[in-house]
Amino acid sequence: YAESGASITSPSPRQFLSLRVRMMTDDPQSAAVLRSVRLNFNPPVAQQLQGELDKGVFAELGQPQEVSLFIKPVFAPQDIGFDEILVRTPPDMSLKFSGLRVGSLEQWENDQVEELTDVQVLETRSDSLWLRMDRLVRRGARAELIEVKFTTALFSSGAVLEAATGNSTLDNSWQQVDPADVTDRAESQGLQILASVTDNKVLSDVQVLP
């Protein structure tokens, strides 16, 4: 960050923290000095957050396709939980919300997951999807796997999505979702989308009429 006191977004809790500092001065007779570093931590929303897209390859460029993002949270007893989900794409992509389902692993196996009907889509940029649920996902909430469905189109050879979860009652509580292989219902093993090598044309069936 550029200003003192600005917030940073942390991944899931880590054992170590690495800092890199660049010090500058406008006076050639004076040297910049770093006297102290102070960090203020928010409580984590979860002990671990992992995510995976259901498809890692788009067959056609420029054509909207529905994608599912599966998020698997792991909670410690003291974690505060989350009720917001944020998904980001590169600037040339846009996101349209389709649905959100939550359930325990047993409910997913038995196709008894709950489709949330009262999900707020909060205003943000077109390349982001900011959702607020009507409940808090936390330890014991029978939400071991979450599916966020949205529609998007790919216009390049590939894109990496970013996801985070947050608690609406706490400022700057966003916590990063790490890419991983979280469920057999998805095949991407991460948060990357690639264009098909067999058909990666943005334009097709182009005709020039007199």
PLM regions: where:
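Beta-strand-rich ligand- or partner-binding modules
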Residues: 1-209
